Amino acid sequence: ENLGATCIDMAWAMLSSKDIPTADKAAAFEQQALKEVGLLDTQIPPRYATSYFNHVWGGGYAAGYYSYLWTEVLADNIATCFAKRGALDPRTGQDFRDKVLSRGNTKDLMQTFTDFTGLKSPDTSALLKARGM
């Protein structure tokens, strides 16, 4: 359900202003967006619809729901690092403190992520594994 909501969110965010459907066509737009990514199940309606997300889609917060899922990707990658290095290993904790926590917003956030994980970019398989896929 979260992946479906994320895909709907991204589909809306990618529209130009001239392509935004009228309110009476929003449900059809959602179904098409889900169909395009293989998440449309006509037997089970989506739990979340566009109208449910006014708090994240209103006020210039485009693709806001997507950011929730992206945060999970980053968190799952960091959790994987802790699992590989030893969550209780003092060096791992100090490394996280030095390379992530102490930086705050003083360094590019993706560089901070890379500095700690050693990954050039986040690995989405960590999210899939965390979700049992």
Model-inferred region functions:
Residues 1-133:
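C-terminal, non-catalytic "cap/extension" segments appended to globular domains
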